[in-house]
Amino acid sequence: MRNAASVGLCVGLSALGAAANDILKPEADYRDFRHYQLNNGMHAIAVHHPRSNESGFAVAANTGSLYDPQDVPGLAHFLEHMLFLGTSKYPEPESYDSFLTESGGANNAYTDEEKTVFFNKVTDSSFEEALDRFSFKSPLFSRQYEEKEVNAIDAEHQKNIPNDDERAWYSIRSLAKGPMSRFATGNSSTLSTTPKAKGIDLVDRLKDFHTQYYCGSNMVAVTISPRSLDEQEALIREKFEGVSAGHADWLGMVQCPGPMFDTVKPFDESNTGKFIHLQSFSSEPSLWVAFGLPPTLTSYKKQPISVLTYLLEYTGQGSLAKRLRLLGLADGLSPVVDKNTVSTLLGIKVDLTQKGAAHRGLVLQEIFSYINFLRDHGVGHDLVSTLAQQSRIDFHTTQPSSSIMEEAAGLAHNLLTYEPYHAIAGDSLLIDADPRLTNQLLQQMSPSKAIIAFSDPQFTSKVEDFDTDPYYGVQFKVLDLPQHHAIAMAVLTATPNAFRMPPPLMHIPKASDLKILPGLFGLSAPELISDQGGNAGTAVWWQGQGAFALPRIAVQLTGNITKEKADLLSRTQGSVALAALAEYLQEETWISKTAG
């Protein structure tokens, strides 16, 4: 925003008219949920939200940019823009937006690799009409709005061009085999200039795409409303049963095809072990190390990628992040992940200092030394079990979202991706604390299987014979990682005592049956519970549990200086002292933040 075959839509389907709460929900969530299926194969979730005066709803299709035809990049995104510019029942192109304005509503949509999600909210009194207008039946795809929406998409893309992170990640993906390498957003060239030059009728292609993928068994719907579950289900059945179930095949069986993109393995020895040197539009250099790993979506109960990203972004004693900071090579480090049904692309982005940019070979040595260290020591069950415990606490203390339409969008996306029972939890809940899959993935993270990208502000003064990307305009050069470098880094051992395995999480509740204590809410004013007085000047106040029943404590430290010391120099010294204290406490505060 991803094979004549795809991951099956909605594994473990429930019967029609299922009972409420046939979906795992947080203990802190007071609402009722229901998963059900329409006669046309469409799956749906209804959420009874008794405390809301709005209704939110979302519809998602199991298709996205990886399904784009090779000769029209951006077609899935273009369909997202064109779908609600008039239907046979409501032909005026602006009628849906006008209706939302009049009913105090809002809407949005997005297209990612394998999903297209449309989401809305309205006042509850307008809920039924909103669903009728939104029911995906007989869109007109009016040609008179083709140019306008192409221009809107082109404007979106133009805003992305200066983003160094987006351009670096795109340069890495562009080396993949199959549709992962393609330009996903679309622009005026791919959606107008080139199709016209080739005699391609864009609207006809749009209609074919819609007919192929927007059918009942390839779609889901979610409603969140103060109305009862039965009433919501009845409305969805009334408004969406008319969506086509699919197409009759030669045996007369109704079919709604899944993804039709190439199932080729995106990354292998032919396109890894590469170094991409690319132009940066920023003054800040960055280094990226990415690995094309096997798909992990179906392993969501074990969360191997979440465990890996925790290991990589850990900033405590003996961490990669701390090591790079101590050496003056980097200011920060963050993992980046793309997951789809054919691959998991895991990246490590390092924000380099000027020293790091000049010595990026040393940065790579430290990165692969750390990965080798993790692989040699192995991820233990103790750490993963505490990550699982923390994920359970986070999940079961989750309150209903303040954005009813964003929550509907998330549920719709999850219903297309995970078992219906886990549509709320998605990939946020580590259910099976088994580190074996994580350790297997670490075995594949070697230099010869990596793609390394260096985003360089001084690119043009250093590189000759470069290429220019046609979509982002970025100048770049792709080189093979020298074999002797790859072999050397694959067997690097860390400097003694440089790295330590992250310990099990601290500061998390051990009990799994936490209860809300009575009488902790509604304090009229904070209560003083400790006052050291004197020169120490330390006081501790209790302000109650707050608005949310969460098993955590918040500590705020406030320092004051006397009036006679409030001059510019003293304030500057105070700011420097606080910054130094924050740096000194970074490890401990990171560990605490990890625990919620």
Curated annotation (Swiss-Prot):
Binds 1 zinc ion per subunit. One of its GO terms (biological process) is proteolysis. GO terms for molecular function: metal ion binding; metalloendopeptidase activity. Keywords: Hydrolase, Metal-binding, Metalloprotease, Protease, Zinc. Zn(2+) binds at H77, H81, E156. Gene3D superfamilies: Metalloenzyme, LuxS/M16 peptidase-like. The active site is at E80. Its cofactor is Zn(2+). InterPro entries: Metalloenz_LuxS/M16, Pept_M16_N, Pept_M16_Zn_BS, Peptidase_M16, Peptidase_M16_C, Peptidase_M16_M. Its EC number is 3.4.24.-. It comes from the Eukaryota. May be involved in the degradation of a protein which is a component of the signal transduction pathway regulating oocyst sporulation. Belongs to the peptidase M16 family. This is Sporozoite developmental protein. It comes from Eimeria bovis.
